[in-house]
């Protein structure tokens, strides 16, 4: 019975750009293409950025400017948990009468797990609860910014050169109306990438970014090349002999979390701004319809669109596995679950000889020859013990039990290899009412809903053989 909860034992094949085998719970179903989709054959789109601590939502441009970090929340540099702001009272001298003191609130950062505080590294307390915390400066920040600016300018130059070469190759195919004077103006103002057909109502602001090629070029950024140092500063004489206090030495993970500073001792650990998380949408690459789209609000866990495969495709699970032995036929009990509200007809088929998808099978399988009918999903009937079951005239040699939208069936497995895990493959053919089909005017012969037949390749892993 434990195998009933092990969904990773049952894999479905996704026929996309790359064949992927995954549990049904990790797949999506495109109602427009009527095909399974995995995370490797969908387009990922970022909908919003938000902080997991304060749940502040920000646009992509602002998140990029802040380096995808929250300005108000911090992570503990010791244990990586979220830091909290704590208040304390300190005595301060009055500016009018230094002999008198008054109590004033002060705020500092503290970790509730490892007891790290901002006072451990000498950070001054703040008079306000949010913002204004001192951050260590990277000694190489100026050099890095210079390099980034230089390579951005270099990339822009290379892009302009590529556009000019493309324009030069297209000159032989330009119409007669494209005169030499026009080409000269295009080259002079670098309009190679802006040759677009004028649209009605187009704004003249598109020309605001143009500049002359000569005399108005941006100031060229020059950098000093890095120079190798002949003499390296030697290590201290007591480097190998002095005792090491492990509580004051940072771990490898703590150093990698601060690559700009590379702290060696615990006294150099400074809090880091918390990383932002994203809400993303998934889109089918074939038809470009959304498969998953979450709510924009960070506090909401609901989805506007969530086409997970377990809500549309019959799910196969292993209920009981007998003792499997080499070249001995055994009977395995499977369960089929209908996730939709209407009746579903399912037919199990054995893989044909030379099937390119049947590459992992190590055993021979005999599936029920008859068509199976799965009752529609009804949440109320599942818990109603007094409900009268429908009469499907099941064959007891094939169907072990039936309850609500679930049915238990027998298959026969004969291992063909003396060692290794036992894996069987078969095809599952089932009908599906495509609710996403275009609506047409109903006629006498039209049922109103398009019914299509889908075939899924299913792989079952039964574990190792017994001696």
From Swiss-Prot:
Modified residues (Phosphothreonine): 414
Compartments it resides in: Cytoplasm, Cytoskeleton; Cytoplasm, Cytoskeleton, Microtubule organizing center, Centrosome; Cytoplasm, Cytoskeleton, Stress fiber; Cytoplasm, Cell cortex
Main location: cytoplasm
Record's function text: Part of the dynactin complex that activates the molecular motor dynein for ultra-processive transport along microtubules.
Family affiliation: Belongs to the dynactin subunit 4 family.
GO CC terms, sorted: cell cortex; centrosome; cytoplasmic dynein complex; dynactin complex; focal adhesion; kinetochore; sarcomere; spindle pole
UniProt cross-link Glycyl lysine isopeptide (Lys-Gly) (interchain with G-Cter in SUMO2), position: 222
Modified residues (N-acetylalanine): 2
Modified residues (Phosphoserine): 203
Name of the featured protein: Dynactin subunit 4
Assembly with partners or alone: Subunit of dynactin, a multiprotein complex part of a tripartite complex with dynein and a adapter, such as BICDL1, BICD2 or HOOK3. The dynactin complex is built around ACTR1A/ACTB filament and consists of an actin-related filament composed of a shoulder domain, a pointed end and a barbed end. Its length is defined by its flexible shoulder domain. The soulder is composed of 2 DCTN1 subunits, 4 DCTN2 and 2 DCTN3. The 4 DCNT2 (via N-terminus) bind the ACTR1A filament and act as molecular rulers to determine the length. The pointed end is important for binding dynein-dynactin cargo adapters.
The keyword Magnesium belongs to this UniProt entry's keyword annotation: no
Keywords: Acetylation, Coiled coil, Cytoplasm, Cytoskeleton, Isopeptide bond, Phosphoprotein, Ubl conjugation
Any coiled-coil regions, as ranges: 152-172
Top-level taxon: Eukaryota
A Pfam family: Dynactin_p62
Record carries keyword Phosphoprotein: yes
């Amino acid at each position: 019975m434990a195998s009933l909860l092990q969904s990773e034992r049952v894999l479905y094949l996704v026929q996309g750009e790359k064949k992927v085998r995954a549990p049904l719970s990790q797949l999506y179903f495109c109602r427009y293409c009527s095909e399974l989709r995995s995370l490797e054959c969908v387009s990922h789109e970022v909908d919003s950025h938000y902080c997991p601590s304060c749940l502040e939502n920000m646009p992509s441009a602002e998140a990029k400017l802040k380096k995808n970090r929250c300005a108000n929340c911090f992570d503990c540099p010791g244990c990586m948990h979220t830091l909290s702001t704590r208040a304390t009272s300190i005595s301060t001298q009055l500016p009018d009468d230094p002999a008198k003191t008054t109590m004033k609130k002060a705020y500092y950062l503290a970790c509730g797990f490892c007891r790290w505080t901002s006072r451990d590294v000498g950070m001054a307390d703040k008079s306000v609860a949010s913002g204004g915390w001192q951050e260590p400066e990277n000694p190489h920040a100026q050099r890095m910014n210079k390099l980034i600016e230089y390579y951005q300018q270099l990339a822009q130059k290379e892009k302009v050169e590529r556009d000019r070469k493309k324009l030069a190759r297209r000159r032989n195919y330009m119409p007669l109306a494209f005169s030499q004077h026009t080409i000269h103006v295009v080259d002079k103002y670098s309009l190679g990438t802006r040759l677009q057909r004028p649209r009605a109502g187009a704004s003249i602001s598109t020309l605001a970014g143009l500049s002359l090629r000569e005399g108005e070029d941006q100031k060229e950024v020059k950098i000093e090349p890095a120079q190798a140092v002949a003499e390296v500063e030697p290590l201290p004489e007591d480097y190998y002999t002095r005792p090491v206090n492990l509580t004051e030495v940072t771990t490898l993970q703590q150093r990698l979390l601060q690559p700009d500073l590379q702290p060696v001792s615990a006294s150099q650990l400074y809090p880091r701004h918390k990383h932002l998380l994203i809400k993303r949408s998934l889109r089918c690459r074939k038809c470009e319809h959304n498969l998953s789209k979450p709510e924009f609000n960070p506090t909401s866990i609901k989805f506007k669109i969530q086409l997970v495969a377990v809500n549309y495709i019959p799910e196969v699970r292993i209920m009981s596995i007998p003792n499997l032995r080499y070249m001995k036929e055994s009977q395995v009990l499977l369960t089929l679950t209908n996730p939709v509200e209407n009746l579903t007809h399912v037919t199990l088929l054995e893989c044909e000889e030379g099937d390119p998808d049947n590459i992992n099978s190590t055993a021979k399988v005999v599936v029920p020859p008859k068509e199976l009918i799965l009752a529609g999903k009804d949440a109320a009937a599942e818990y109603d013990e007094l409900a009268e079951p429908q009469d499907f005239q099941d064959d007891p040699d094939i169907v072990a039990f039936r309850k609500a939208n679930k049915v238990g069936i027998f298959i026969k497995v004969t291992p063909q290899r003396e060692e290794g895990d036992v894996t069987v493959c078969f095809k599952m053919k089932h009908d599906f009412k495509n609710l996403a089909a275009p609506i047409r005017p109903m006629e006498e012969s039209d049922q109103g809903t398009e019914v299509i037949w889908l075939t899924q390749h299913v792989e079952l892993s039964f574990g190792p053989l017994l001696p």
